[in-house]
Structures are given as structure tokens and as C-alpha cells.
Amino acid sequence: MFNHRIEGKDAIVADRNPETHVIDFRAAEHLLAARDPRGAVKLLDSVIAAHPENTAARLLRARAFFAAAQLRPAQLEFELVLEREPDNAFAHFALARTYERSGQAAQATRHFRLAAALDPKPEYLQAAGFDTGN
């Protein structure tokens, strides 16, 4: 029988299980709501390492990156979410805001319009420049 010890970051990942990943995800939601996006990202890193296909975790991490003004990582995460869920209006809207903050107006406009087309919420319509009739 081999008896070796896992140390460092690998030990943290090895210690995790599906239940702790759910707890970490929920805790990350609370950290983001409490304006601690960097703390949320740290928790979500282990969740995504174990479940890279989890779109909800990636979307939450993208929001945390955005809140921490880490625009490039936010953009990459939102794009990955949209590869998997091209009809996710919120992801289009959030990606548009990310492009807007990074000075990429043409890309922002495109995604604002996609968000509004997918879900005609007043906030999405206004951001897309569509007349809301108000």
C-alpha cells in the first residue's frame, strides 16, 4: 500500500467533494453580494476546477471578475458561458457591460442588442438603444 501525502493546492482540491462545492458556490454568491468579489473568485476556482462544465459557477465567477474590475478574465468567462448557452440574455448583457467598461463600443452594442432580442427587459432595451415607448 502506498502512503503518500498530498500537499499544497492539490490537497485543497483533493479535500473537496460535491457537497463542499455546493457550499463554496453558495458562499461565493454571498461574498459577491457582500462586495467581496475576490473572495468569491477564490472559492469558485476550486468549484470550476472540479466541475469545468458548470455554467452557473462560470457565470458567477465572470460576475465576480467584473465586480473586481478584472475585465479580461470576466470577458473570457462570459464568452465561455455564451459558447455553451448562446441564448443566455443575462450573459450577453453582462458581456456587453464588460466590453463597454473596456472601451469596446461596437462589441458592447452587439451584445446589448442580442440581450434585448432574447429578453426584452426594459434595462436591456434601453442599453441596446431601442425605444421603450416611455
Give the positions of each predicted feature:
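Structural marker of alpha-solenoid helical repeat scaffolds
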Residues: 16, 50, 84, 101, ...
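Start-of-helix register in tetratricopeptide repeats
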Residues: 22, 56, 73, 90, ...
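Structural signature of tandem alpha-helical TPR/SEL1-like repeats
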Residues: 34-42, 68-80, 102-114
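Long, contiguous interaction/recruitment modules in multidomain scaffold/adaptor proteins
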Residues: 1-23
